[in-house]
């Protein structure tokens, strides 16, 4: 893989999760453009730099020796990548503190460097949280590849920070410079809420939760076919989002024990709040993590999963395949993985390579619900 070469450092970076023969690099031209601009503008200690949505630590690791850097993302994998890439390049793994996007930031910040996220609601929430956190004369710069930079990103910067100037495009990347202005403090429109009829529950969704304004159609297809009569089974909701699958299952299985895991900190916070609102103090484990990577082998009886098919702007089934491998390792012999997926993704064939028995539980014109037994 090529090195990230900037005026600050030459770094050997890896993506998370790691893949054998990884076809993609852990930085892009927008990272390079932003680092070159910051170097030209002049960055030095004791500047406090906030880096938002740095997917694999390219920005934070480059700047760490030259300023006090704080990173904030909504991704457990991004936090893990930052630690690994710092250590990989001769720095302490904790040289840059990471603040989950679900938690408050503590300014003041002299620089705010933003990689524009795929979900603009996350950007809006982050900009709202910046209110009162900028030092006098602070610089706020957002970066993105042009193909992933909607006009509305600039509109949000202007609404919550101040006037925006766009750079020329360089290597298909662009920077947006926002000049902070005194503004009336705004309240956040997040979290949002919606109600389900079956089961009859209300779900809260923080800004970066998938389908935060309503139930996604895959989950809607899955809900009527969740397993029942689980007794005291140990159940995991893998990639739990707002927790709806686990909560619906728990309502039907009052003695089962649940673990909810997602790599989004905002999803985990949403799931924990939804569980408490619906099920009170019933015992549960809700955690951010790299799927079931840290789950003890042979420690689960059932896994529920609506697998993602993209990581940021990268589309593919590599995350789903990884989840299937993790589920197989965590399940006891005879345990079962239940999934929903688009018909065209061919999950039945993929699961048949890993599990001794795969059956179709139900189907709609667009989705299949599958049960794979270890």
Curated annotation (Swiss-Prot):
Keyword S-adenosyl-L-methionine: yes
Entry GO CC: cytoplasm
Chemical reaction(s) catalysed: guanosine(1835) in 23S rRNA + S-adenosyl-L-methionine = N(2)-methylguanosine(1835) in 23S rRNA + S-adenosyl-L-homocysteine + H(+)
Pfam family name, one: MTS
GO molecular function terms attached to this record: 23S rRNA (guanine(1835)-N(2))-methyltransferase activity; nucleic acid binding
Protein keywords: Cytoplasm, Methyltransferase, rRNA processing, S-adenosyl-L-methionine, Transferase
EC numbers for this chain: 2.1.1.174
First and last residue of the signal peptide: none
Localization annotation: Cytoplasm
Top-level division of the source organism's lineage: Bacteria
Enzyme class: transferase
HAMAP family: 23SrRNA_methyltr_G
Biological role stated in the UniProt entry: Specifically methylates the guanine in position 1835 (m2G1835) of 23S rRNA.
PANTHER family: RIBOSOMAL RNA LARGE SUBUNIT METHYLTRANSFERASE G (PTHR47816:SF5), RIBOSOMAL RNA SMALL SUBUNIT METHYLTRANSFERASE C (PTHR47816)
Family: Belongs to the methyltransferase superfamily. RlmG family.
Descriptive protein name: Ribosomal RNA large subunit methyltransferase G
Gene that produces this protein: rlmG
């Amino acid at each position: 893989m090529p090195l990230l070469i900037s005026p600050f450092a030459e770094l050997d970076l890896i993506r998370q999760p790691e893949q054998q023969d990884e076809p993609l690099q852990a930085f892009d031209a927008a990272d390079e453009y932003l680092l070159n601009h910051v170097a030209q503008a002049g960055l030095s200690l004791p500047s406090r730099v906030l880096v938002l949505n740095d997917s694999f630590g390219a920005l934070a690791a480059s700047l760490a020796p030259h300023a006090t850097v704080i990173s904030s993302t909504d991704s457990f994998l991004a936090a893990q990548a930052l630690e690994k890439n710092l250590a990989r390049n001769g720095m302490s793994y904790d040289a840059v503190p990471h603040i989950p996007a679900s938690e408050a930031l503590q300014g003041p910040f002299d620089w705010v460097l933003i990689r524009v996220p795929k979900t603009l609601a996350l950007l809006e929430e982050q900009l709202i949280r910046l209110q009162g956190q900028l030092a006098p004369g602070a610089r706020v710069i957002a970066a993105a590849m042009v193909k992933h930079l909607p006009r509305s990103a600039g509109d949000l910067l202007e609404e919550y920070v101040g006037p925006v100037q766009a750079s020329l495009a360089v290597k298909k990347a662009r920077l947006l410079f926002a000049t902070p202005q005194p503004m009336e403090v705004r309240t956040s429109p997040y979290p949002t809420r919606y109600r389900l009829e079956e089961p009859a529950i209300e779900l809260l969704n923080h800004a970066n939760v998938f389908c935060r304004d309503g139930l996604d159609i895959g989950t809607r297809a899955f809900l009527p076919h969740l397993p029942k009569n689980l007794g005291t089974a140990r159940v995991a909701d893998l990639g739990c989002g707002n927790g709806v699958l686990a909560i619906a299952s728990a309502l039907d299985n009052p003695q089962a024990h649940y673990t909810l895991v997602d790599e989004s900190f905002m999803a985990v916070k949403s799931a924990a709040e939804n569980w408490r609102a619906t099920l009170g103090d019933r015992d549960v484990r809700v955690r951010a993590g790299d799927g079931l990577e840290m789950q003890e082998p042979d420690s689960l009886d059932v896994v529920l999963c609506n697998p993602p098919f993209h990581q940021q702007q990268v589309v593919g089934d590599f995350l789903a395949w990884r989840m299937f491998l993790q589920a197989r390792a965590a399940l006891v012999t005879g345990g079962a993985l239940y999934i929903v997926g688009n018909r065209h993704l061919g999950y039945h064939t993929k699961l048949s390579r890993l599990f001794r028995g795969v059956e179709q539980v139900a189907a709609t014109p667009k989705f299949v619900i599958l049960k794979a037994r270890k």
